[in-house]
Amino acid sequence: TTSSAAAPETEPPEPADSPSAAPSSSGPKYSGKSKAPAGEFRAADIYGPAQNVPKPTNPPGYTEPTLDGMMKSMKAWTQWRNYGMQTGDYTEAYKFVSKNLVEEINAYNADAKLYHDGGWIIGGEQRSYDFRNDPVHQGNGVYSWDFFVGWSYIITVGADGRHKRSRNTNYADNLYTLTVHYEETGWIIDSITRKQTQK
């Protein structure tokens, strides 16, 4: 979702590297060591994936062929992308992305496979997207828009309990530009490019 790009102040404890300390591979896995009550969101941790992740709702007018419709679509995309990171379900996020944007689609596919195989991602709920300035019309119905991705860490946990932690050590590297155009079904992202930082 669009929100402050400040890094979270705390992180979950580092999962133990010893396989014996990893959560058991048998039976269901629950964050917080137990099944959350219906409707209670519980973030992912070393014990299991996120539970009861709120499902985003697309805002009215997000498919309209207007600048306002485009901006609503891009913000909806960030919400569905975060939802996918926490659940492995990128069904809606795919709809905002061109089939030619292979790197983005491959990222969705990899996350979906991780969840399908019994793994999960820790830290997905803390990722934020801050769109900067106004979108720029590049001609022929194509717009570009700068955005900042705020995150401090991501941990992927395999079904066997083995984990991999990625840390964000350079926030200046998190500026991107996307380009988007309109089709009959709505606004579609054509490219996502990391902006070169000035030195």
Q: What name fits each language-model region?
A:
Residues 97-100, 108-109, 126-127, 148-151, ...:
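A mature extracytoplasmic/lumenal domain signature
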Residues 80-88, 129-145:
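N-terminal short leaders/motifs
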Residues 1-69:
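Juxtamembrane and targeting peptides
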Residues 35, 42, 121-122, 126-127, ...:
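Polar low-complexity intrinsically disordered regions enriched in Ser/Thr and small residues
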